[in-house]
Amino acid sequence: MKKVLFLVGPHASGKTYSSREYIAKNENIGMIDTGPIMRRIHKEMDPDTSMGDWVKKLEVQYGKNITSQLISNEIGKIMSNDECDKFILIGFRTLEGIAFTIQHLNIEDFSILYVDATKELLYQNYLAREKKNISFEDFKNYLQNELNSGLTKLMKMALNGEMIDYYYRFSNDDNFEEKIDSYLTNCEIKKLRKEPKNGK
């Protein structure tokens, strides 16, 4: 049976970097990022249409679960062809998408961790990773749009301790590899909760 950890949270919160660091030190663990999967499917199906318009068109034709189904199908293929028995899944933005994947792939052993950070840290990491010249104000608007896509609901559930755990990073020195390990090795999970100072 595959063990799955869903890492969710805003762009540039450190999910991918920390996962890669953890995987480099541990064997038999895979990481699947839904972002590249979705971009590849978009390129194969309708490259001349923008991602947003393409998704809207698909949902009109096939229903709102179509993107979740496409992503889940690809995740299922990767898992079935990979010898790893533990996976970290990154890129989910909605509870509905996570729930669909869990049900569609019959995932019984799973955990969900919301990784958050200060807006300043997110901005710093975004600039370093994307190499884009964007103002802090524009980035905050970008971040709010991302939260509005479904992350706000996940964050509130995490803060309330409803099925989702929560980890808050004040700096890039806040390493949560130990927390990842606690989920993937079946150790007793301690509800480590780093609450944001001054309400973020």
Q: Where are the regions a protein language model picked out?
A:
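P-loop (Walker A) phosphate-binding loop of NTP-binding proteins
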Residues: 10
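ATP-binding Walker
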Residues: 13
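Walker A/P-loop
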Residues: 16
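Conserved beta-strand scaffold positions in the cores of enzyme catalytic domains, especially
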Residues: 28-31, 112, 163-169
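ATP-dependent small-molecule kinase phosphotransfer cores
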Residues: 30-88, 92-100
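Conserved phosphate-donor/acceptor-positioning beta-strand/loop module used by diverse small-molecule
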Residues: 90-91, 107-130
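Small-molecule kinase domains that catalyze NTP-dependent phosphoryl transfer to phosphate-bearing small molecules
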Residues: 127-199
